[in-house]
Amino acid sequence: MSRRSVGLAAVWAAFLVLAGSTLVLAEDEAKMAPEFTLPDLAGEDVTLSERLKEGPVIVDFWATWCKPCIKAFPDLQEIFDNYKDCGLSVFAISIDGPRSTSRVGALIKSKGNTFEVLLDPAQKVAKKFHVTSVPRTVLIDTEGKVAWAVTGYRPSNHEKLAEAVAALYPEGCEKKVEGEEPEAAEGTGE
């Protein structure tokens, strides 16, 4: 095989991998997210449907041994900080097994993250979401539909997720977060 053929084959393979990721994303969107209840770090149960009553939810499957997962945390924290006052929740769902679950809380604390961490050591919820690798990030709208999803971490994912979250707040949220009130319409004096 010539060098050119090898090069073209590599480009084609890369295209297929990227196209496959995009197809999986499109396939996920508009599906209903599976219901779940998981314990948080304090042992309190958190239920998806209950939280969706308050606003959209970002579900991020991760593990302590996954470096790309940890690289994504500052991006998730930034989005959470921008929208938490408008009801957005972020569930960082650890799929660490029973032997490494004890490291989850310390790692989150060391990173300064304030979003919720849930534990899925048997990976039952991860299986419901068809997680095959981490990180796996899923944005769920208030109706329980998957609005956006991606597997893996790239810096560009942050911008795409931020845009998808913003689209769920057509009236805008960031103004509310910053403490600005919408201007009242002027009366007609009647």
Task: Indicate residue ranges for each PLM-predicted region.
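Thiol/disulfide oxidoreductase modules built on the thioredoxin-like
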Residues: 106-114, 120-166
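Structural microenvironment flanking redox-active thiols in thiol-disulfide oxidoreductases
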Residues: 70-111, 121-128
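Short pre-active-site segment immediately N-terminal to redox-active cysteine/selenocysteine motifs
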Residues: 55-57, 61-65, 133
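Boundary at the C-terminal end of the N-terminal hydrophobic targeting segment
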Residues: 24-26
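Non-globular targeting/processing and membrane-anchoring segments
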Residues: 170-190
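N-terminal secretory signal peptides that target proteins for export/translocation
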Residues: 1-5
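Bacterial N-terminal signal peptides
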Residues: 9-21
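A short beta-strand-turn-helix
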Residues: 36-57
